[in-house]
Amino acid sequence: MGDPVTWFDLGAADEEPLKPFYAELFGWTLQPASERYTVVATGGGINGGIGRSRSGDPWVAFYVDVADPQATLDAAESLGGKTAVPLTKVSDMLTFAMFTDPDGLIVGLTKAIEGEGNGGGSVGQGAPVDWFEILGSDAKRSQAFYGELFGWTYADADPSYGLVDTGAGRGIGGGVGASGQGMRWATVYASVEDVERYLARAEGLGGRREYGPLDVDDHMQSGAVRDPAGNVFGIYHHEPH
């Protein structure tokens, strides 16, 4: 069984502008957890948080729930990654760490007591966050790295973009691949009813369009925005077959 993606975070040197941006863009419920961190309740998929960046650099990351974060950090380093944030205890119920993969993309690790913030499902409102995406420089290398690290398997599809099956039965699905346009990120996507409308709304709220709308196939459109801090956040719309 693979490890599930269960949480996301957004950070900035000044996190305050991010709160109204995401609340108004997606209709999410925000609840302050501390002076520097606000919990985001979405309308489905996984929840997340908005916090102050210790380094001052903006960042977006999703977290993978693992049995042993330190062992996973060690494994990531042996596969060509680097520790970005060492194992940190948030409370008696939660520890986390972060690493960068061979492309320098940042991904989080977490270990939580079942039902205590580790992907039990969203109870908020607004757009669901139900997809993650890793775009590196070499699809085969990225797929091998994450497959080995988290036990993920990939659907037999376009070799430049593998659909992830974590096999965990919780968390969200995603894709690992590479872009011919030079796009590099590890981020999450919100499901919306109209990609163009949300891209335009983001621009009106102080963000900018990263790409889109892009017709992925006959049933799906995608796009991405850069928030006021410069973080890339994806959006998509899927029409049922």
What are these regions (language model features)?
Residues 4-13, 53-137, 155, 199, ...:
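Vicinal oxygen chelate
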Residues 146, 155-204, 208-214:
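Structured core of small recognition/catalytic domains
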Residues 34-37, 56-58, 90-95, 158-161, ...:
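Short acidic/glycine-enriched loop/turn segments that link adjacent beta-strands
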